[in-house]
């Protein structure tokens, strides 16, 4: 039996678990192909260092292996995504492309162009929010404007119900009529960077989950004080994982709520609340 093929375009969501768009794509069809596009416009940014690219490549390697373990595949391409994503969708005869919304102006314009091109080709587009616990439109003043002061933002944001993490998608159906050539993962040198050092933080979904588990069982209870001392292991060390989306924000929030339930003192609960406010700050 053949199934329609859907693409899931990975960007800042390099994971299988707690991935809303990927889970939704798998509900539509068992034949889902992941795709990641190395965008020169982003790789050439002034804030892009070799270590950042090395971490990204490590995350992609882990994601590729996770897809393979579930019978699927992750396709990696390079070029302007405004052209490349529609080309990949057309080549694979995809009937739909899924991705997550972004807040950055460049990403929003890029996505608008890609969506328009896909619509012209008769390919469905499915988009939803994933990187935030609440989309920007959900947290506004009584006048319907974004908050400019954090305290009332936090008060409103924290009162909203938080969605639970979604499970990893079921195994993918093996491809039948469509053959996808294996594209090797490029090195940092291939992408124009030189890096021969070791990463301080291990890349990938499994490593991020392990780091979250360790933090939420230990340092989170003293975070309010220990975060002020750089020489102490008092922080979560999850910033890179959240930036590249190798761990879902709903998973992170759920871990903090579980820690609250196990807190044995007011000081511990206050520390956890302080960390939760840092998570809210990401969305302010």
Swiss-Prot record:
It comes from the Bacteria. Coiled coil: none annotated. SUPFAM superfamilies: Cryptochrome/photolyase FAD-binding domain, Cryptochrome/photolyase, N-terminal domain. InterPro entries: Crypto/Photolyase_FAD-like_sf, Crypto/Photolyase_N_sf, Cryptochrome/DNA_photolyase_1, DNA_photolyase_N, Rossmann-like_a/b/a_fold. GO terms for biological process: response to light stimulus. GO terms for molecular function: deoxyribodipyrimidine photo-lyase activity; DNA binding; FAD binding. Residues 4-133 form the Photolyase/cryptochrome alpha/beta domain. PROSITE patterns: PHR_CRY_ALPHA_BETA. PANTHER family: CRYPTOCHROME, CRYPTOCHROME CIRCADIAN CLOCK 5 ISOFORM X1. This is Uncharacterized 31.6 kDa protein in atpI 5'region. It comes from Synechococcus sp. (strain PCC 6716).
